[in-house]
A protein has these predicted regions:
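Conserved C-terminal guanine-recognition region of P-loop GTPase G domains, centered on the G4
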Residues: 52, 76-144, 217-219
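Canonical P-loop GTPase G-domain recognition
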Residues: 114, 123-181
Length: 294
């Protein structure tokens, strides 16, 4: 058997470009992207297929100190990424210090599997700073191969992909060869709506929100979607809806445009807002939304 396959798990601090990298590798927007921390909440697989190999990339939440139960569940996803990886990608950006979480950083420097340290956002750097950063990270993570990249500009991404293929273990594919991800359609509807909330609202509002798609009906030409935005308090519900529903309408229009590109079909979407009190600290609700796996 000459076929290769393996899990390549991407970890790092918030906003270092993990989701941008996976989307670039896969060639599809599977992970939502905003400038806000904690945009990625779940562990999302993106699958790259070739006749001779299959790479299962795993995007993970940025590493933080949990402040409530939802964030604890998010960090559990990161822990699971250490346990099943064949190759670990530790992603940092120019000027960044190592992970604040000592436990996770120790797991990286003592990993028994290949570690690729990707020094991202080099388009915002100069040659002198870049060389200094490479030396700094070589000293901090001596077990890692270092690749300066720009995930946004797609610089050096192909070289990283080639190195991953070199390092993959011999294995049959883990997923069908036409698979792109492990997530269902409704997950991407939920995430697209949540991305628009992250982009259109400030302060605590985006972090108090969860999205659930109650209806996804697809026929030959159109997909009919009914989704619900969950918030924790009535005041948040009013802010999400906005004056005469204008803010919610804007979210719906933006989400529909993205979903029509993603599914390549006409989309009819209805979005409602409900209060789900303190869902971020409710074990039952976290399980319902796919966070608490315990």
């Amino acid at each position: 058997m000459s076929h290769k396959a393996g899990f390549v798990n991407i970890i790092g601090n918030p906003n270092v470009g993990k989701s941008t990298l996976m989307n670039a590798m896969v060639g599809e927007k599977l992970s939502i992207i905003t400038s806000k921390a904690q945009t990625t909440r779940h562990r999302i697989f993106g699958i790259v297929n070739d006749e001779e190999y299959q790479i299962v990339f795993s995007d993970t939440p940025g590493i933080i100190k949990p402040a409530y139960d939802l964030q604890t569940s998010m960090m559990d996803f990161v822990k699971s990424a250490f346990s099943d990886a064949d190759i670990l990608i530790y992603m940092v950006e120019i000027g960044e210090k190592e992970l604040k979480d000592e436990e996770f950083f120790n797991k990286i420097i003592h990993a028994k599997i290949p570690v690729l340290l990707l020094l991202n956002k080099i388009d915002k750097s100069n040659q002198e700073l870049l060389e200094e950063q490479v030396q700094t990270w070589q000293a901090k993570v001596p077990n890692a191969e270092i690749f300066p990249i720009s995930a946004l500009e797609n610089f050096n991404v192909k070289e990283v992909l080639n190195r991953i293929v070199d390092l993959l273990p011999l294995s049959p594919p883990y997923y069908p060869k036409d698979a792109l991800t492990d997530k269902p359609e409704r997950f991407f509807v939920n995430e697209t709506i949540r991305e628009k909330i992250l982009l259109n609202y400030d302060k605590e509002i985006p972090y108090a929100v969860e999205v659930e798609t109650e209806e996804f009906l697809e026929d030959e030409k159109i997909i009919r979607i009914r989704s619900v935005i969950m918030v924790e308090r009535d005041t948040q519900k009013g802010i999400i809806i906005g004056h005469k529903g204008a803010a919610l309408k804007k979210v719906g229009m933006q989400a529909r445009a993205d979903l029509e590109l993603f599914f390549d079909k006409q989309i009819h979407i209805e979005i409602f807002v409900k209060v789900n009190k303190d869902w971020r600290n409710n074990a039952f609700q976290l399980r319902r939304f796919g966070y608490n796996q315990k």
